[in-house]
Amino acid sequence: MFKFKASDLPEILTRWSARYSVFVPSGSPDNAQMRIWSRRTRKEVRFMEPDEYTNLIVAPKGFVFGEREELFRWEGNEKTCTAISAPSSSSLQEEDKILFGLRPCDTYGLAYMDRFFLGEHHDINYHLRRQHVFIVAVNCLEAGPECYCASMGTGPFAEITAHTEYGMQAGKGYDLLLTPDYGPDHKKGEKGENDWYWVEAGSDRGKALLSHVAPLLYRDLEFTGRRRKKALQEDALKTFRRTLDTSTVRQVLAAHFKGEEWDAIASSCIACTGCTRVC
């Protein structure tokens, strides 16, 4: 298994930025947002280390899903309606981009969107954006106060399951997966001499990303990496303050499917799509 020194992470991001648009978490612990990283902006962007934030304040859905966009046009009258243009991706000009620092819960969500929008209900615009997005996820060593991903099987570590269209072995949705392994002298937000990242490729695209930074990688025994990762995951599971019993979720939701609370929520809807944008 490969690993690299935490102190080399800025250089890795910079090397990637020579080929891709690289987005990294920036801001404050309670307001982490994606900002672009490059040799030019490196000193302007306050890059947040993975132990400085729990998750982004807004999900990264906007990188693959347009807030508003034209799907088709039609013409007609009271009796007939005829489509005069089909969905087209010709108007979307996308460039390859890397989203660094996504958490396992969001990568699982991305994999679910892949399964839907790239499956039977194929969405051309989603497809175009998705094929240009590379995901570098980072496992969580500590749960946030409101986190319950362990109960849902979507964290704190991403696991390898089924394949998606882009070769990702994902119920996870990542191309690369990093696991922080901090030394005993580690200080939050800093890079100590004994701080490392274990790195695993989840797709051929992920392997290509690694090839661009090969001189900065160290190879360790697969057994050593797996054993260390398992220990870190067990420690992370102990940090959860919330749990959720999912055994009866289906029955509870079905029983309240026509509940009055949904009517109350619907009455305030102004069709801004904000809820689906951030979820």
Which residue ranges define each predicted feature?
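Iron-sulfur-associated redox domains of electron-transfer enzymes in respiratory
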Residues: 1-252
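Long, contiguous internal "core" modules enriched in hydrophobic/ aromatic residues
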Residues: 253-263
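Cysteine-centered iron-sulfur cluster-binding motifs in ferredoxin-type domains/subunits
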Residues: 262-278
